[in-house]
């Protein structure tokens, strides 16, 4: 005899298979799924619980079920009694059953049929009560009709009907936009709340500023020194370092890690050792906001110079306070007042003149005024109330990075919040790792670093970029997963942005000596056109670059053509042919330049102009949709009507169109009429049918593709 499976046993008792599985697990029985067979001893143990529950539940059921249970019990107890007595009891019970039926309505009769096997329903409800509609639901972008119906506890057909009344034809898998969702929710009186999906691979989310953190404590200010070349930025940095660092570290060797810390009046200050604003701008371009205070160095004998203005603009865009250090005041030709006067034109007005900008006269060479500058930095930092929480997981920014021959990839980091520890799992930029060693700006090995502390770490898998952000994760697997995902995404992005040749950048690459040959793939509608075009292109004579035909063929542009163009760094010219869907996707992904023409002269002129650096297109063709001709109708005085189904994008009334048959362009012109049912339509979207007539063209056949396009003006 075959053994009874879990789901069969559950069905017999009218309970869920999960309840049986849970009970078996409580009995220390390993269960793989509901198809597992039960042993006899397991069934006996389960019977003790579930049969007893069933018996208790049945005593609470309606009159009919009570009599039925009593009949079963009597039959079990009186097995040895005479059959006629058993029949009498049976009749008595049947009478009771009939009486119970007469006292119940039709709805209960249906439930009695369902309960004929003595199922253990606790409440003996006649039917499952409909769930109450919630007053508020949350949704994700792209929610479908079916998913919305589940959230509202209603049938999806109800939503589909409402959409139909709103003029929207939809099915259960149709995605709903926010406007449609609001209409439906308003109709049902339900409040909507959009769920924000957090992308854990986006490191910027870990840098979001929270409300006032009660555990935050004061942290050192991070200072960047900027200014014009030869105005004394490096000398000022060296002077501060020599005065405050080397003097306090007898015999100590300062490790160059792109930043260093000093202590002044009992408070630490972190200086970014990146003179100039190139690195500063690079960091800001990558979203890194690391600087708290900017020091603008201006030579007293030279005044405001072009790079000074550039530095002022960078500081303003970064929205950080600026302290002006008027350097070289010990020179005979120094004129600090002239510097102040010139800087007022750029919004930097000295406090002495009623402004808010602090000016500090100093000499980086002699050290005069250095203490005053450090004091002003401390005052500005105090006003800013710079705080951070050292008890959090560390986050921060890469200052510098290099590939060391002995240690592998090394990165100088600035901790902006939290505490960085040796052994932490880190994601930095598009790489990850586990911190193996950590060195401070004095070359000392340390085990932890708090906010605003610059350190150099090793243990990461690759070299990050300056300005990349880093985040510490408790779980090493999570750090690995996020790091690998970010690396993969960056590789894909680099492929998409690979510098393939196009007619737009051809002349630029020629000037840089990067282009010697222009590789061309030609696809045409007939062999004669292909040969004529190839011969014409070979005759183009421009100094510095040769046209090289690497492939010619007849037919539509396909994916293998794009692959060849990408591998050979070439362009594709289509003459009276179009790319198929796969070729379009591949060209966009690989950034391959495709040029489609119908006149040979235009091809020659375009390529020759590009090679001479004269190419200046003002408009670009943009395909907006395709429709497949399903049926044609010939109407007198109208012409051929193409009954079409929009397969991609949309067809608009004012768009240009071309008729494509077997990948060959037959005609290019304009729409005459566009109708949806009997009404004129401005546009017909994907998934809908429409009637189309083409101006001055009636040779439309079933299976033809109508491609709609617009000419879009592009910036050069």
Curated annotation (Swiss-Prot):
Residues covered by region (G1): 227-234
Record GO terms (molecular function): GTP binding; GTPase activity; translation initiation factor activity
Annotated GTP binding sites: 227-234, 273-277, 327-330
Superkingdom as given in the UniProt entry: Bacteria
Cellular compartments annotated: Cytoplasm
Membership in a protein family: Belongs to the TRAFAC class translation factor GTPase superfamily. Classic translation factor GTPase family. IF-2 subfamily.
Annotated region described as G3, given as residue ranges: 273-276
Name of the protein in its database record: Translation initiation factor IF-2
Its biological purpose: One of the essential components for the initiation of protein synthesis. Protects formylmethionyl-tRNA from spontaneous hydrolysis and promotes its binding to the 30S ribosomal subunits. Also involved in the hydrolysis of GTP during the formation of the 70S ribosomal complex.
Low complexity biased stretches: 56-125
Gene Ontology cellular component list: cytosol
Organism (species): Staphylococcus haemolyticus (strain JCSC1435)
Upper taxonomic lineage: Bacteria, Bacillati, Bacillota, Bacilli, Bacillales
Region annotation G2: where it falls in the sequence: 252-256
Stretches the record annotates as Disordered: 52-135
Transmembrane segments: none
Region entry G4, spans: 327-330
Record-annotated tr-type G domain positions: 218-387
InterPro entries xrefs: EF-G-like_DII, IF2_II, IF2_N, P-loop_NTPase, Small_GTP-bd, T_Tr_GTP-bd_dom, TF_IF2_bacterial-like, TIF_IF2
Principal place of residence: cytoplasm
Coiled-coil ranges per UniProt: none
Keyword annotations: Cytoplasm, GTP-binding, Initiation factor, Nucleotide-binding, Protein biosynthesis
């Amino acid at each position: 005899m075959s053994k009874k499976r879990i789901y069969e046993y559950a069905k017999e008792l009218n309970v869920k298979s999960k309840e049986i599985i849970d009970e078996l697990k409580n009995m220390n029985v390993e269960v793989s799924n509901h198809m597992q067979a039960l042993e006899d001893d397991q069934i006996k143990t389960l019977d003790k619980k579930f049969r007893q529950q069933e018996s208790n539940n049945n005593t609470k059921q309606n009159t009919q079920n009570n009599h039925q249970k009593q009949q079963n019990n009597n039959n079990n107890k009186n097995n040895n009694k005479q059959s006629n007595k058993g029949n009498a009891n049976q009749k008595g019970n049947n009478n009771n059953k009939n009486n119970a039926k007469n006292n119940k309505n039709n709805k209960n009769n249906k439930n009695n049929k369902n309960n004929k096997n003595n199922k253990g329903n606790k409440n003996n409800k006649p039917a499952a009560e409909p769930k109450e509609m919630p007053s508020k639901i949350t949704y994700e972008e792209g929610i479908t009709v079916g998913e919305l119906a589940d959230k509202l506890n209603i049938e999806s057909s109800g939503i589909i009907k409402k959409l139909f009344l709103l003029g929207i034809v939809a099915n259960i898998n149709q995605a709903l936009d926010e406007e449609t969702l609001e209409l439906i929710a308003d109709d049902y009186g339900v409040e909507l709340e959009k769920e924000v999906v957090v992308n854990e691979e986006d490191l910027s989310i870990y840098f979001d500023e929270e409300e006032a953190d009660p555990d935050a404590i004061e942290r050192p200010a991070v200072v960047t020194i900027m200014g014009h070349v030869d105005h004394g930025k490096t000398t000022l940095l060296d002077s501060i370092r020599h005065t405050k660092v080397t003097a306090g570290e007898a015999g100590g060797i300062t490790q160059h890690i792109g930043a260093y810390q000093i202590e002044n009046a009992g408070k630490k200050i972190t200086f970014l050792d990146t003179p100039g604003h190139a690195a500063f701008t690079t960091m800001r371009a990558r979203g890194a906001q690391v600087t708290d205070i900017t020091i603008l160095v201006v030579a007293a004998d030279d005044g405001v110079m072009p790079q000074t203005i550039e530095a002022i603009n960078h500081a303003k865009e970064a929205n950080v306070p600026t302290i002006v250090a008027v350097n070289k005041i010990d020179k005979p030709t120094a004129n600090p007042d002239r510097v102040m006067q010139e800087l007022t034109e750029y919004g930097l007005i000295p406090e002495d003149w009623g402004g808010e900008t602090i000016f500090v006269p100093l000499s980086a060479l002699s050290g005069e005024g250095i203490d005053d500058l450090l004091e002003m930095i401390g005052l500005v930092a105090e006003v800013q109330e710079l705080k951070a929480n050292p008890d959090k997981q560390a986050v921060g920014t890469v200052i510098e990075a290099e590939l060391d021959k002995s240690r592998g990839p090394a990165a100088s980091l600035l901790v902006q919040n939290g505490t960085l520890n040796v052994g932490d799992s880190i994601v930095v930029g598009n790489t990850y790792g586990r911190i193996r060693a950590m060195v401070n700006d004095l070359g000392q090995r340390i085990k932890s670093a708090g906010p605003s502390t610059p350190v150099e770490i090793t243990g990461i898998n690759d070299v990050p970029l300056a300005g990349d952000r880093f985040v510490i994760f408790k779980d090493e697997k999570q750090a690995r997963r996020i790091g690998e995902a970010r690396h993969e995404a960056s590789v894909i992005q680099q492929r998409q942005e690979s510098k393939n040749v196009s007619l737009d950048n051809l002349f630029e690459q020629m000037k840089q000596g990067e282009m010697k040959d222009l590789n061309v793939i030609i696809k045409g509608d007939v062999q004669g056109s292909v040969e004529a075009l190839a011969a014409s292109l070979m005759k183009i004579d421009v100094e510095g670059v040769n046209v090289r035909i690497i492939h010619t063929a007849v037919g539509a542009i396909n994916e293998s053509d794009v692959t060849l163009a990408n591998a050979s760094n070439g362009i594709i010219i289509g003459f009276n042919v179009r790319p198929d869907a796969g070729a379009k996707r591949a060209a966009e992904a690989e950034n391959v330049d495709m040029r489609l023409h119908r006149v040979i002269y235009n091809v020659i002129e375009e390529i020759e102009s590009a090679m001479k650096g004269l190419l200046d297109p003002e408009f670009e063709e943009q395909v907006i949709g395709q429709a497949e001709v399903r049926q044609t109708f010939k109407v007198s005085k109208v012409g051929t009507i193409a009954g079409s189904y929009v397969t991609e994008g949309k067809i608009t009334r004012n768009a240009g169109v071309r008729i494509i048959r077997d990948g060959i362009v037959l005609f290019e012109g304009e729409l005459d009429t566009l109708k949806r049912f009997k009404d004129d339509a401005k546009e017909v979207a994907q998934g809908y049918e429409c009637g189309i007539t083409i101006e001055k063209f009636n040779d439309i056949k079933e299976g033809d593709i109508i491609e709609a396009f617009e000419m879009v003006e592009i910036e050069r």
